[in-house]
C-alpha cells in the first residue's frame, strides 16, 4: 500500500524533528547507565556526597537504597535488583560472596568506621566515659540491634569489655539501624546512644560525643562487593574504582572514617 504525499510529508517532518532532538543530546547521554546501590545506614550521608561527585564525572545516575546491613543482605538474597552492596561490616559481603548473588573476587574494605557515645543531654556534658554508663540518672541507652547492625555488635563488645553489660541491660533500647539510634539520641528520646562517628559529623555536630578506645571493640571494617545484577554494568565497576581511590578516601576522612 502506497503512502500518500501528505503522509510522506508528515513522516518526513516527524523524522526531522526526532533528528533535531537527538542531536541536542550529547552522544554519550544516549547510553547513560544507571546503577542501584544498597548502602548501610551509617554511610548514607557520605554516600550522597560521593553520588554527586561520581555523577559529575560520569553519565547515568546512582539510586540509593539504605538500611541496616542485615536487612540489605536479606533483600539481596530475596532478589532486590541492586548492583553494589556497601555494608557496615565484612560478614554480610562474605556470605554473599559464597552465593550466586555476588561476584567473587570483587569484595574489598572501603572504610573502617568509628564507634562513639553520643548524647544531647546537657547533664552529661561534663561527665566522663565510661563512668556515666552506670549512673542512676541514665535510663535509656541506645544501640543498634546486634542481630543485624554491625555497630550494635561493636557496642555489645564495648559493654562486655567494660564488664557493665549485665548492669545496664535493662536500660538498653535496640534500634533497627545505627542511624535510627543516632536520631533517637539527637531528638532526646535516649539519654545516650552508641553511634557511628560519621552520623555525628554529618548532622551539624549537635550535642557531644565521647570517643571509645579502639581496644574495647573489634575494628568495624566496612566491605563493598559487586552484585550479580551489576556484573555487566560499566558504571558499577567504575564506581567501585572511584570508591577505592585516594581522593575518595580523603573525602571520607572528613566523616570520621579511618584507613589502614
Stretch-by-stretch model annotation:
Residues 1-8:
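N-terminal secretory signal peptides that target proteins for export/translocation
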Residues 11-14, 71:
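Hydrophobic H-region at the start of alpha-helical membrane spans
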Residues 13-26:
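Bacterial N-terminal signal peptides
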Residues 26-32:
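Sec/Tat signal peptide C-region and signal peptidase I cleavage site
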Residues 32-57, 63-65, 70, 74-80, ...:
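Exported/periplasmic ABC-transporter solute-binding proteins
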Residues 105:
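Active-site acidic carboxylates
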Amino acid at each position: 500500500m502506497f503512502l500518500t504525499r501528505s503522509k510522506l510529508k508528515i513522516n518526513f517532518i516527524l523524522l526531522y524533528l526526532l533528528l533535531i532532538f537527538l542531536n541536542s543530546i550529547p552522544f554519550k547521554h544516549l547510553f547513560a547507565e544507571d546503577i542501584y546501590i544498597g548502602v548501610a545506614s551509617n554511610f548514607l550521608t557520605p554516600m550522597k556526597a560521593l553520588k554527586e561527585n561520581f555523577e559529575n564525572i560520569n553519565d547515568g545516575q546512582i539510586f540509593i537504597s539504605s538500611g541496616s546491613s542485615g536487612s540489605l543482605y536479606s533483600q539481596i538474597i530475596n532478589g532486590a535488583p541492586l548492583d553494589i552492596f556497601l555494608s557496615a561490616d565484612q560478614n554480610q559481603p562474605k556470605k554473599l560472596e559464597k552465593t550466586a548473588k555476588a561476584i567473587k573476587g570483587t569484595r574489598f574494605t572501603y572504610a573502617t568506621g568509628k564507634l562513639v557515645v553520643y548524647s544531647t543531654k546537657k547533664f552529661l556534658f561534663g561527665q566522663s566515659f565510661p563512668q556515666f554508663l552506670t549512673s542512676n540518672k541514665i535510663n535509656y541507652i541506645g544501640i543498634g540491634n546486634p542481630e543485624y547492625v554491625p555497630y550494635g555488635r561493636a557496642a555489645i563488645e564495648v559493654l562486655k569489655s567494660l564488664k557493665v553489660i549485665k548492669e545496664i541491660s535493662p536500660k538498653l533500647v535496640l534500634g533497627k539501624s545505627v542511624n535510627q539510634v543516632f536520631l533517637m539520641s539527637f531528638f532526646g528520646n535516649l539519654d545516650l546512644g552508641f553511634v557511628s562517628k560519621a552520623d555525628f559529623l554529618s548532622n551539624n555536630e549537635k550535642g557531644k560525643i565521647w570517643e571509645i578506645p579502639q581496644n574495647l571493640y573489634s575494628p568495624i571494617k566496612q566491605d563493598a562487593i559487586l552484585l550479580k545484577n551489576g556484573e555487566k554494568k560499566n558504571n558499577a565497576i567504575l564506581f567501585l574504582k572511584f570508591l577505592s581511590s585516594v581522593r575518595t578516601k580523603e573525602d571520607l576522612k572528613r566523616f570520621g572514617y579511618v584507613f589502614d
